[in-house]
Amino acid sequence: MIHEIFPVGMLGCNCSVIGDESTQEALVIDPGDEIERVLKLLQQHQLKLKQIIVTHAHIDHVGGAMKLKWATGAPILLNKEDYGLLKMLDIQAAWIGAPPPGADEIDQSIEDQDTIQCGTITGTVMHTPGHTEGSTCIYFPSEQKLIAGDTLFAGSIGRTDLPGGSFNKIITSLNDRVLALPDETVVVPGHGPLTTIGEERQSNPFLVKR
């Protein structure tokens, strides 16, 4: 599996380009900005973009999705519980002093337990509300990788003080869903360095059992 991870935009959102070497199909997860870099990587690996997946509708994760759709024709997938946040993109842009990206057009809602297929690569959607109502993670069992969006970080968790956030919900999502994964699972958070489920289970102050 090809997996390129790189920070984009003023808030350093971790964007993932995932490709199947046998079929040359690709996914892009959280294209928040710098779409030229995404397109360059797709071209470099000779990949055809099949789907654009957004873990949640905060501008730093979804801000470049429409531009990527225009460039490639690939559909945008996002959980429907975050559609309301999409209508606030101009407001979100003002929060961080960024230019408004314009409206995003979502092609399909991704739901809990949906299968994401990219050639021979299979991912499973996990609905993990808390950071936002529609926050999702994508788990790739054969690769033991979790694209966590802003649900889990190395040593921390997603903030819950923005519209749609709930501390109780994110803790439930983490305890019931995310920590059910094997300790060896590599976590690709929405920002910052990679970690593992085992490391977070042992040392994350929000998750350590007292």
Regions found by a protein language model. Name each.
Residues 2-4, 48, 75, 108, ...:
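Conserved beta-strand segments of alpha/beta enzyme cores
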Residues 6, 18, 112-118:
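Short acidic-hydrophobic surface loop/beta-edge motif
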Residues 16, 108, 113-114, 136, ...:
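Residue-level detector of beta-strand structural context in well-folded domains
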Residues 91-95, 118-210:
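Metallo-beta-lactamase
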